[in-house]
Amino acid sequence: MVLHLLLFLLLTPQGGHSCQGLELARELVLAKVRALFLDALGPPAVTREGGDPGVRRLPRRHALGGFTHRGSEPEEEEDVSQAILFPATDASCEDKSAARGLAQEAEEGLFRYMFRPSQHTRSRQVTSAQLWFHTGLDRQGTAASNSSEPLLGLLALSPGGPVAVPMSLGHAPPHWAVLHLATSALSLLTHPVLVLLLRCPLCTCSARPEATPFLVAHTRTRPPSGGERARRSTPLMSWPWSPSALRLLQRPPEEPAAHANCHRVALNISFQELGWERWIVYPPSFIFHYCHGGCGLHIPPNLSLPVPGAPPTPAQPYSLLPGAQPCCAALPGTMRPLHVRTTSDGGYSFKYETVPNLLTQHCACI
C-alpha cells in the first residue's frame, strides 16, 4: 500500500489539475522510476569512485543467456515431453493359469507385451522411442550367442499378422537391452493398443518388478497440417467497398482531447538509460505503465457499482467519497512485481531480486 501511494504521488504533477494535462515528460517518469527501484533494492554497491559497481564487462556465458536483440521477438519454447509406458497385460510369470503359456513362449524365445499409449501421447508427434528389455544376460553371454542369428528381434501384431519392426540396438546397462525404434515404426505409438513380440532365444521370463520391460517415448506438438498452414497463409479479404467505408477512411483525425480521459500509458525504459546497465544485467529493458488522464466525465447518481473482480472503467469510480474529486490512479491490488538479476562485482556473481508493485495493470478513477 505504501508503494501504491508513492507511485500515485510521484506520478502526479504539481498543481490543481492533478490528474489532467498532457503526458508526463520522460525525464520526470525516469526520475520517479529510479526512486522506486532504489526504494525497493537500495543503492547499488560502490566499488570505485563515481558509484559504478565495477567496470568489467559481463562474461559472454552469462550475457548471452539473458539478453535479446532489441526489436526481436523471443522464441517460443518448444513443447516436448517424455512418456514411459509399462505393459498392460495381466499375465505374468507368477500367474499359475498363464504360467504354462508363458513358459512355452519363453522356451521358444518369444515374449509378448501389450502397451496402451495414452490419449496425450497419441495426439502428439513421436520423435523417438526405445524399448527397454531385461535380458538377464551379461555381455559375455551376449557375445557367446550364435552370431549367425540376431540375438533380439521385434515384431508387432497387426490385422494381417505379425510384422517386423525395424530397430537398432543401443548402449544399455548390464542385463538390459535397449531397442531404438526406427522412424518408420514410430507411428505404432499412435494406436490405442500396441502388442509387441520380442524374440530372444537366450532370455528367460522374469517376474521381478525391477525386470519389467517398458517403452520410453519422446513426443512434441504436432506441426500444423497443410490445410491449417494454407488458412494461415491466405491473405485477408479486402474491405468491401461501400460509401460508409469511404466516409470512415476520409474522416479527420481525432483531437488529442479524445484521449485525455483516464488511461494507462506505456513507456519502454532500459537500464542503460537509467545508468544501471552494470548493476541490473537482466532484463535489459522493461515496459513501464502508469495511469494518466482526467476523470471529468459526468457520473449519473444511479450508476451501478462495478462487478466484483472486474476493473472499473474510467467512467465508473472505484471509490468516491461525497465531495471528493476522482483521480486517475492504479487500481489497488492489481500491481505486479518486476524480477531482475543484479550483480555487484562486475559479473562474478548474480543475485535475483524483486521490485514489488511496479507494473500497473489497470487504471481507474479513484
Swiss-Prot record:
Proteolytic processing yields a number of bioactive forms. The 20/23 kDa forms consist solely of the mature alpha chain, the 26/29 kDa forms consist of the most N-terminal propeptide linked through a disulfide bond to the mature alpha chain, the 50/53 kDa forms encompass the entire proprotein. Each type can be furthermore either mono- or diglycosylated, causing the mass difference. Residues 1-18 form the signal peptide. It is found in: Secreted. Changing N302Q: Loss of glycosylation. Its main location: secreted. The keyword Membrane does not apply. Originally found in ovary (granulosa cells) and testis (Sertoli cells), but widely distributed in many tissues including brain and placenta. In adrenal cortex expression is limited to the zona reticularis and the innermost zona fasciculata in the normal gland, extending centripetally into the zona fasciculata in hyperplasia. Also found in adrenocortical tumors. Also expressed in prostate epithelium of benign prostatic hyperplasia, in regions of basal cell hyperplasia and in nonmalignant regions of high grade prostate cancer. GO terms for cellular component: extracellular region; extracellular space; inhibin A complex; inhibin B complex; inhibin-betaglycan-ActRII complex; neuronal cell body; photoreceptor inner segment; photoreceptor outer segment. Glycans are attached at N146, N268, N302. It comes from the Eukaryota. Residues 19-61, 62-232 form a propeptide. SUPFAM superfamilies: Cystine-knot cytokines. GO terms for biological process: cell differentiation; cell surface receptor signaling pathway; cell-cell signaling; erythrocyte differentiation; hemoglobin biosynthetic process; male gonad development; negative regulation of B cell differentiation; negative regulation of cell cycle. The record marks R61, H62, R232, S233 as: Cleavage. Keywords: Cleavage on pair of basic residues, Disulfide bond, Glycoprotein, Growth factor, Hormone, Secreted, Signal. Belongs to the TGF-beta family. Disulfide bonds join C262-C328, C291-C363, C295-C365. Inhibins and activins inhibit and activate, respectively, the secretion of follitropin by the pituitary gland. Inhibins/activins are involved in regulating a number of diverse functions such as hypothalamic and pituitary hormone secretion, gonadal hormone secretion, germ cell development and maturation, erythroid differentiation, insulin secretion, nerve cell survival, embryonic axial development or bone growth, depending on their subunit composition. Inhibins appear to oppose the functions of activins. Dimeric, linked by one or more disulfide bonds. Activin B is a dimer of alpha and beta-B. Inhibin A is a dimer of alpha and beta-A. Inhibin B is a dimer of alpha and beta-B. Interacts with TGFBR3L; this interaction regulates female fertility. GO terms for molecular function: cytokine activity; growth factor activity; hormone activity; inhibin binding; protein-containing complex binding; signaling receptor binding. This is Inhibin alpha chain. SMART domains: TGFB (SM00204).
